[in-house]
Amino acid sequence: MKMHIARDSIVFLLNKHLQNTILTNKIEQECFLQADTPKKYLQYIKPFLINCMTKNITTDLVMKDSKRLEPYIILEMRDIIQMMFFRTLQKHMFFKEHTDLCTEYAQKIEASCYHYTYQQQEKTFLEEYSTRCGTINHIINCEKKSHQQQDNDALNKLISGELKPEAIGSMTFAELCPSAALKEKTEITLRSQQKVAEKTSQLYKCPNCKQRMCTYREVQTRALDEPSTIFCTCKKCGHEFIG
């Protein structure tokens, strides 16, 4: 009985995307006849489901290992991700006024993330795909925190046409946000070059032994326009704390 339930579900998922009942039944039947266990049946059908999602399915597709992909979840997830991108883009006035373009870009951005992830395969597909989509969604969000609003390079290029939505999924952070990447690189370089010489002071009280015999050093751990972080070490008990 479990095998029949699984087969019905597979037929439904395949036909949902193929929109061709004859081809769907033929593919599913071939996989079923070649499999002698439910596990092998699922192994055989997976490549067809995966290619179905990318709309590249053919009757002569070679069956091979799908590298731990989770096709059943992804089939339903892609529509949800596309809607997420659509809502994020629509926060910008330009896309509110161009709904058709917003829909097109949302679909192409999601497809770009999908194909990029499909080529990676170092992690499980679902984990990599979700992470990639979340990163891209943050980058194109025009409602970032105030100190991040000037870093909307990718969104501005998307609107101007300089950046193609179908290419965004495979681009690096430096390619998508050159201004933010340069700023981050500058901060890292500055932190690595700064002097961290320790000084002795009685200004800081050790929370462990309550003594005021401490060495301290200042390190720029946050943005350049924010105060340095002071790391203290008690000379009496060796306890380390932030001043």
UniProtKB/Swiss-Prot annotation:
GO terms for biological process: DNA-templated transcription. The lineage of its organism: Viruses, Varidnaviria, Bamfordvirae, Nucleocytoviricota, Pokkesviricetes. PROSITE patterns: TFIIS_CENTRAL, ZF_TFIIS_1, ZF_TFIIS_2. A zinc finger (TFIIS-type) spans 202-242. Transmembrane segments: none annotated. Keywords: Early protein, Late protein, Metal-binding, Transcription, Transcription regulation, Zinc, Zinc-finger. Belongs to the TFS-II family. One of its GO terms (molecular function) is zinc ion binding. Residues 77-201 form the TFIIS central domain. Putative initiation factor. Necessary for efficient transcription elongation past template-encoded arresting sites. InterPro entries: TF_IIS-typ, TFIIS_cen_dom, Znf_TFIIS. Zn(2+) binds at residues 206, 209, 234, 237. This is Transcription factor TFIIS homolog. Pfam families: Zn_ribbon_TFIIS (PF01096). The keyword Membrane does not apply.
